[in-house]
Amino acid sequence: MAIKSDRWIREMSEKHGMIEPYAENQVRFDKNGEKLISYGVSSYGYDVRCAREFKVFTNVHSAIVDPKNFDEKSFIDIESDVCIIPPNSFALARTIEYFRIPRNVLTVCLGKSTYARCGIIVNVTPLEPEWEGHVTLEFSNTTNLPARIYAGEGVAQMLFFESDEVCETSYKDRGGKYQGQTGVTLPKT
């Protein structure tokens, strides 16, 4: 397996729609010249942006977290340019970008140091061969203070690894439960 470069990411996005919308280079300023947390293609990865839809974890309904029987009332929905995650809490969001992963590629997501250095951890499971959709992002606020997440700005980096052989069964082949997801997607069994 080899990590893929900016040239490969650009070509796959422009010719095959691997990342839509695709941002060339690292975007660091908005149209008014204000600083952003960077997003777009980098040397060996792609920094994704967070959309304006969030689900923030709450316990107003005294729910129990059960991945086999998840209660949607465990979250409150927020649509905003900024999401405030309560101390020691959790939020879900999604990428602005829609991904179509090639059959011989595995994509791994890592958090951005800008957030990690503030105690905000991003978790995403690997994007498997032939998976497609908006990526659901999981944010953990590990601090005892409220934390901000900015929509429209970089939140995580995707790394693309191309295998030297094609897998026998892709995510699409086995009918993966998150195939084609749009919006923030809650746990499924």
UniProtKB/Swiss-Prot annotation:
GO terms (BP aspect): dUMP biosynthetic process; dUTP biosynthetic process; nucleobase-containing small molecule interconversion
Transport: present as a keyword of the record? no
Positions contributing to dCTP binding = K112, S113, T114, Y115, A116, R117, T136, L137, E138, Q157, Y171, Q181
Identify the CDD domains for this entry.
Answer: trimeric_dUTPase
Q: What class of enzyme is it?
A: hydrolase
What Gene Ontology molecular-function terms does this entry list?
dCTP deaminase activity; nucleotide binding
* Entry keyword set: Hydrolase, Nucleotide metabolism, Nucleotide-binding
Please state the Enzyme Commission number of this protein. Answer: 3.5.4.13
Report whether Nucleotide-binding shows up as a keyword of the record.
Answer: yes
| Biological or metabolic pathway of the protein | Pyrimidine metabolism; dUMP biosynthesis; dUMP from dCTP (dUTP route): step 1/2
Q: Which residues are the active-site ones?
A: E138
Q: Which reaction does it catalyse?
A: dCTP + H2O + H(+) = dUTP + NH4(+)
Show the Pfam families listed in the entry.
DCD
- What's this protein's function? Catalyzes the deamination of dCTP to dUTP.
Q: PANTHER family recorded for this chain?
A: DCTP DEAMINASE
Q: How does this protein assemble? A: Homotrimer.
Family assignment? Belongs to the dCTP deaminase family.
Q: What is this protein called?
A: dCTP deaminase
Origin species, per record, is: Acinetobacter baumannii (strain AYE)
